[in-house]
Amino acid sequence: MVLATTLPDTTWTPSVGLVVILSNLFAIALGRYAIQSRGKGPGLPIALPALFEGFGLPELLATTSFGHLLAAGVVSVGLQYAGAL
């Protein structure tokens, strides 16, 4: 309850969207090298570059979920609280 009253309310702006996109790209790049057993689940329905060989649906869901959590922390706790957004 205390945390909800101390953090400022975040409104959606294009700069917030850019932070979310950059956080997701960072998480995908990090997941590309951090996930040890890739390609165990279903693949993506689109062709990917050779750099992402074995990067399927479970890996995409895991990395974008982490990217959204990372973005929520960066936006609400970091940039919004500092007044940058």
Swiss-Prot record:
- Which InterPro entries does the record cross-reference, listed alphabetically? PSI_centre_PsaK_sf, PSI_PsaG/PsaK, PSI_PsaK, PSI_PsaK_bact
**SUPFAM superfamilies linked:** Photosystem I reaction center subunit X, PsaK
Q: Which family does it belong to?
A: Belongs to the PsaG/PsaK family.
Report the subcellular localization: Cellular thylakoid membrane
Tell me the membrane topology, using the record's own terms.
Answer: Multi-pass membrane protein
Q: What is this protein called?
A: Photosystem I reaction center subunit PsaK
UniProt keyword terms in alphabetical order: Membrane, Photosynthesis, Photosystem I, Thylakoid, Transmembrane, Transmembrane helix
Record-linked HAMAP family: PSI_PsaK
Keyword Membrane among record annotations: yes
**Which species is this record about?**
Thermostichus vulcanus (Synechococcus vulcanus)
